[in-house]
Each structure stands twice: as C-alpha cells, then as structure tokens.
Amino acid sequence: MENCRTPTNKTQITLNRTPTLKERRWNTLKVNTTNVRCSTPIFGNFRSPNLSPIESMGTKKSPVSPMRFAFKKPPAKAHPHPHQHQHHHHHHKHIHRTQLKPPPFILPKPQEEIIEPEREIKICSSPDTFSDDSNMETSLVVESRRRSIKASNHSYVVNHAANVEQILMHMGLENYVTNFEEAHIDLVKLASMERADLVKIGLNADEDCNRIMDVLQTL
C-alpha cells in the first residue's frame, strides 16, 4: 500500500485557455467593429472562420458588363466624296423602300359578287335581249326569264312532290297544311282549285292565295 498512494508534490501545468477578465489580456485585441463581422473573439493567431470584412457594394464592379457597352457605335469611317455620299444615300434609301415595302394583298371577292356580274353579262349578251339599248325592254326580258325559271322550279316540285304538304312547304305556306288535310285535298284536287276554293278552306290572305295560284298556273 505504500507504493500506491496519491502524489503530494505540487506541479504547475500550463494550458491554453480562453482569456479572462482577470488577466486583462482581452485589451490586446484590435478589431475595427465597424468594418469587420466576427462571432468569436480573436486571440493570437486564432481567427474565427466566420470573420469577414464589410465592404461597400459601390466599390465593387459587377462581373457582367453593362448593356450600354453591347450597343457601341461602330467607329466612324472617313467621309467619302459628297457626290458619292449622296448617290450611296439615295441608293440605300431606294433599296430600303423597295425591300421593306409589304407585298399588296387583295382580298378575294365573295362568290355572290362573282356570279352576279356573270349572270348580267350572259343576259345582256344573249340574242333574246338584243334590242335598241332600251332599259325597259331589258328589264322586261329579265323579269320574264325570272318568272320562267320560277315556274319551272314550281312545276318540277309539283311533278315530283308526293303530297300537298311538300308543295306547301316549298312555297313557305306550311301553316296551311292542316286546312288542306281537313278539306281532304290531294294533288289532283289541288290542280283544279280556284281562288274561291282557297278562300273556302281558310286562306284569307291575298298574298298567300296569289302564291298558290301562281304555282297552279304553271301546271
């Protein structure tokens, strides 16, 4: 037990430690707090990794050049002869106008505007309408042709219609279908009807009676 005992000799051990207020060693730190950021004190050669100087952004240059340098004007060339300069300016102006002028764009005419002049040319150039340039005769010929075409259309519908209802629908008089059905009028009776017969079954409008009589006259 004599060999195993706690040593009693006093020994001074020097260890690195953080400066304390007792030793007043913190006064040796020279840090400009207005221009330096630090989160831990600086002592000797020890510096905090969070230490960074504060610099004004105005003194730094942007790595990207301003846009105004990208649009620099080309260096001025020697001025040519005045006559050559005028000729070149006139030629350049002429090229600029001819090249940048948009091509003319013409809208196509509607189909109705193309068909109507062709009809008028055919009517005026036909031998039936040849006259002494009288407007009245021309209008009469046009009206007679219109009526003949209308009559041919009516006769085609009447000849190919299956019943009276189809004829009335062709003339736009489908409202009177019930009147003809109640009177038991078929295609044979319709062809022999007169204006008084139409009034009897309820067709009181003169315009409607005239339209039906025009169709019956074409038969």
Swiss-Prot record:
One of its GO terms (molecular function) is DNA binding. Keywords: Cell cycle, Chromosome, DNA-binding, Meiosis, Nucleus, Ubl conjugation. The keyword Nucleus applies. Residues 74-104 are annotated as: Disordered. SMART domains: SAM (SM00454). InterPro entries: SAM, SAM/pointed_sf. One of its GO terms (biological process) is regulation of meiotic cell cycle. It is found in: Nucleus; Chromosome. GO terms for cellular component: chromosome; nucleus. Residues 159-219 form the SAM domain. Its main location: nucleus. PROSITE patterns: SAM_DOMAIN. Probably ubiquitinated: degraded during the oocyte-to-embryo transition by the anaphase promoting complex/cyclosome (APC/C) containing cort protein. Residues 74-99 have a biased composition (Basic residues). The keyword Ubl conjugation applies. Interacts with polo. Interacts with cort. Polo kinase inhibitor required to maintain G2 arrest in the meiotic cell cycle in females. Holds heterochromatically paired homologs together from the end of pachytene until metaphase I. Haploinsufficient locus for homologous achiasmate segregation and may be required for the maintenance of heterochromatic pairings. This is Protein matrimony.
